[in-house]
Amino acid sequence: FTTFYREFGSVLKEGLGEDFGNRERILKLLRFSTSNNDAVSTSLQDYKARMPEGQKAIYYVTADSLNAAKNSPQLELFKKKGIEVLLMADRVDEWAMEFVHEFDGTPMQNVAKGAVDLGDLQDAEEKKALEAAAEQFKPVVEKLSDSLKAKTKEVRVTTRLVDSPACLVTGEGELSPQLIRMLQQAGQAVPESKPILEINPEHPLVRKLENSAQFDDLANVIFDQAVIAEGGLPD
């Protein structure tokens, strides 16, 4: 099966968008790398069996390469908490997952889309800390939003980051950079889309913004670093 999957895994994934009647069967055949294991060997059944008590979703991230997926800043909080994340680096993954919202009754959640919510896996103290940081950094966020309004849809404080100053996320219901690139390469027209910039209030570079005389320059450095970590943005 491993040899077969290496050759035809991408074809199987295409079936998620083309063969609705067999979607559940196809999902059971898929195999993924994870943040705990580089080998393309984990099924969705395996992942669910390893989920800790309190985890309410199957978490995954898409990227242009396995290395990019493994080093995605969006994984930092999950790694810190020891939560396994599926790594999807096949070109067809982002498109295929648009047709998958749950597996065996458990929601599928792209960790790079929307606000991060770990539910019971995130304690009340962490949620309070985020609220306090959001209030403290409100002036910085407003200033950043204005400085980067041509590049971002929104700027907000997040708890998903541990080591990185910032990351880019896609709004709920919007197309990801990977999917936009894929559609553009296929010659399809794509609506204009801007990413959401999330900042880490604990990072020294972000804290430096509070009293920086070169605010706009520093804001652009932070944004550009987030773009590089994302593997670039579509044209």
List each language-model region with its residue ranges.
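Conserved GHKL (Bergerat-fold) ATPase module
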Residues: 1-235
